[in-house]
């Protein structure tokens, strides 16, 4: 019976791609695995290709490498991947800023990045992904193009097709200390070591080309969605025509922890990256400041500030290529597993950054971008197993209850150390007490029927709801409880979470991190220190962290800087 169910589900996914590929409604059902193309897999699948993140060089990851490792992604259950930008990028080590291995320093919209492969390789990857029921989201650059410094020698003729200075806003650097001038952010240039010339998207020549170009790319390669980089640096007026032209779900990167700024772009885009929630997930699971009481606060702020927009189309995440890895903030296994589970069961479209399944713990870019192949693609890693379990459960719930993806969680109980919430038939209990502690939650009110038996997805056990519809449950060793009616799980078997406690990662004074559960060791930067857990730059764009947590007024003051 299980085999028949699986086949029907697979066929259904294939048919959906033909009929509704790229629609907002269908993207709600997707679970995204974000790939940094250069760091995921090499052509031949080898696992010993050297890669030093600190060198800021190309390490050899390709589209063919991704295709050859789709089974790794498919085994975790992901049904969408987000790949790096595909355009040709500036070559060489630019003024000490490194190479454009990440794909964000584009110079030619009409050519592919040859470091990642050929046109045939890209077509083959997308075809193979679709055959496996996996959609492909393209990271798109529409805000800027890269020039080699210095400005006095800037060669606009090196760019294609925008090969004249007149296609760009006049040079000025964004001043992040100016908080009340949108024009400064939208028209000035970013400082990234290279010159990121800011495209004049208000010009019809520029905007029309970009809309037509990405419409053509989507048609030619059969992309299913777009992630749009640096949305906050662009005028709102550009996006409606661009979104209409491309015709697929587009999620904009709004790198801001201010909910007003974040939600303002929902007026012109289907979805945005939910950095506001990302910050609160981080605080909650690291027991920082107000802890889990921030989750209902988040819900209240969203209801007040963003109620006219559809939050279920936002991207939910805890890591990406611009952020410190979450295990940099905490080495506690249950806190990390809890944060992973939260992302994969919460509202919105979940996105997992490559390497989260292996526990990557690097800090500031480039330490957060090691090569995945140096882990041997370990499928026994506990983080891999929790992702696999939660992805399978989320997909199962969606098949049982299609309205689940448009519903939102209702908070039932929260404190600094725990949170309880329910969405339809899914009840969640999270805590941040760590792997050496247990916590019992007494008589939690639920929406279940009296005396109903519920299954704990995470721990593979059952509990019984009381006659008064309340539930008393214990969270052991800091792990969460994810519950669902036992009667509705008949015939469905979830993967088992490996909860074997792994030794804490130890770091030498060099850039090599040694662990007992990665084979072989991989290179990444690791930091220790004292002080507050977060330091926010004047731009509010970069979170720096140290290992010692500070509670109370320090955190309150930081939140004041961020949001008021």
From Swiss-Prot:
It is a lipid-anchor; GPI-anchor. Ca(2+) 1 binds at residues 143, 198. Substrate binds at residues 56, 105, 227, 232-233, 322, 369. The record marks 322 as: Transition state stabilizer. Residues 539-564 form a propeptide. Coiled coil: none annotated. Binds 2 calcium ions per subunit. Calcium is inhibitory at high concentrations. It catalyses: Endohydrolysis of (1->4)-alpha-D-glucosidic linkages in polysaccharides containing three or more (1->4)-alpha-linked D-glucose units. Keywords: Calcium, Carbohydrate metabolism, Cell membrane, Disulfide bond, Glycoprotein, Glycosidase, GPI-anchor, Hydrolase, Lipoprotein, Membrane, Metal-binding, Signal. N-glycosylated. It is found in: Cell membrane. A lipid is attached at residue 538 (GPI-anchor amidated serine). Ca(2+) 2 binds at residues 229, 253. GO terms for biological process: ascospore wall biogenesis; carbohydrate catabolic process. Residues 1-21 form the signal peptide. Its EC number is 3.2.1.1. The active site is at residues 229, 253. Belongs to the glycosyl hydrolase 13 family. PANTHER family: ALPHA-AMYLASE 3, ALPHA-AMYLASE FAMILY MEMBER. This is Alpha-amylase 3. It comes from Schizosaccharomyces pombe (strain 972 / ATCC 24843) (Fission yeast).
């Amino acid at each position: 019976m299980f085999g028949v169910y699986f086949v029907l589900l697979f066929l259904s996914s294939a048919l959906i791609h033909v009929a509704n590929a790229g629609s907002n409604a269908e993207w709600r059902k997707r679970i995204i695995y974000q790939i940094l193309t250069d760091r995921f897999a090499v052509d031949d699948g080898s696992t010993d290709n050297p890669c030093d993140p600190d060198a800021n060089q190309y390490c050899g990851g390709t589209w063919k490498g991704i295709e050859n490792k789709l089974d790794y992604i498919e085994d975790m259950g992901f049904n969408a991947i987000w790949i790096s930008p595909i355009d040709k990028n500036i070559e060489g080590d630019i003024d000490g800023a490194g190479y454009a291995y990440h794909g964000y320093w584009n110079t030619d919209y009409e050519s592919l990045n040859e470091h990642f492969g050929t046109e045939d390789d890209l077509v083959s990857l997308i075809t193979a992904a679709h055959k496996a029921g996996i959609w492909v989201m393209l990271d798109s650059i529409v805000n800027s193009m890269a020039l080699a410094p210095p400005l006095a020698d800037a060669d606009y003729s090196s760019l294609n097709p925008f090969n004249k200075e007149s296609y760009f806003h006049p040079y000025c650097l964004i001043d992040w200390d100016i908080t009340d001038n949108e024009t400064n952010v939208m028209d000035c240039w970013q400082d990234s070591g290279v010159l990121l010339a800011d495209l004049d998207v208000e010009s019809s020549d520029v905007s029309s080309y970009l809309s037509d170009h990405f419409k053509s790319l989507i048609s030619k390669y059969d992309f299913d969605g777009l992630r749009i980089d640096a949305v906050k640096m662009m005028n709102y007026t550009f996006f409606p025509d661009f979104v209409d032209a491309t015709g697929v779900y587009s999620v904009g990167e709004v790198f801001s922890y201010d909910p007003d700024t974040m939600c303002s772009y929902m007026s012109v885009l289907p979805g945005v990256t939910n950095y506001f929630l990302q910050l609160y997930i981080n605080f909650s699971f690291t027991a920082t400041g107000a802890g889990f009481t921030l989750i209902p606060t988040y819900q209240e702020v969203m209801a007040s500030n963003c109620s006219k927009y559809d939050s279920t189309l936002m991207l939910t995440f805890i890591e990406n290529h611009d952020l410190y890895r979450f295990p940099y903030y905490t080495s506690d296994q249950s806190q990390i597993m809890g944060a992973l589970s939260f992302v994969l069961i919460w509202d919105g479209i979940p996105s997992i950054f490559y390497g989260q399944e292996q526990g990557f713990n690097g800090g500031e870019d480039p330490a957060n971008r090691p090569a995945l192949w140096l882990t041997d693609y370990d499928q026994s890693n506990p983080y891999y197993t929790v992702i696999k379990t939660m992805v399978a459960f989320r997909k199962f719930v969606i098949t049982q209850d299609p309205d689940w993806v448009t519903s939102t969680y209702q908070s039932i109980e929260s404190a600094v150390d725990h949170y309880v919430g329910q969405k339809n038939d899914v009840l969640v209990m999270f805590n941040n007490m760590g792997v050496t502690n247990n916590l019992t939650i007494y008589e939690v009110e639920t929406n279940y029927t009296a005396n109903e038996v519920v299954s704990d997805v995470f721990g593979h056990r059952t509990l019984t709801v009381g006659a008064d519809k309340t539930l008393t449950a214990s969270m052991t060793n800091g792990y969460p409880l994810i519950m669902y009616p036992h009667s509705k799980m008949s015939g469905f078997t979830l993967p088992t979470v490996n909860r074997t406690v792994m030794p804490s990662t130890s770091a030498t004074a060099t850039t090599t991190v040694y662990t007992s559960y990665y084979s072989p060791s991989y290179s990444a930067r690791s930091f220790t220190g004292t002080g507050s857990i977060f330091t926010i730059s004047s731009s509010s764009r970069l979170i720096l962290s140290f290992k010692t947590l500070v509670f109370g007024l320090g955190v309150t003051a930081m939140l004041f800087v961020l949001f008021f």
